[in-house]
Amino acid sequence: MSWRTVIIESKAKLSYKNDHLVIRAEDVHMVHLSEIAVVLVESTAAVITSYLISELSNWKIPIIFCDTKH
């Protein structure tokens, strides 16, 4: 059941590993894709792998990209 909104507000690398979204910033966080309702990328300094984009699409998880002005 998805319930998390993942918000990326600063420099980070987003990737995929074993059905998890991996967020590498100052430290590393992993969130299982089944828990994610939406990914909101508010930073223009974020990097996201194409494989993660593909997996989010397969799981029907929307990705929203915006800048500081929204």
Predicted feature residues:
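N-terminal intrinsically disordered, cationic/polar leader segments
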Residues: 1-70
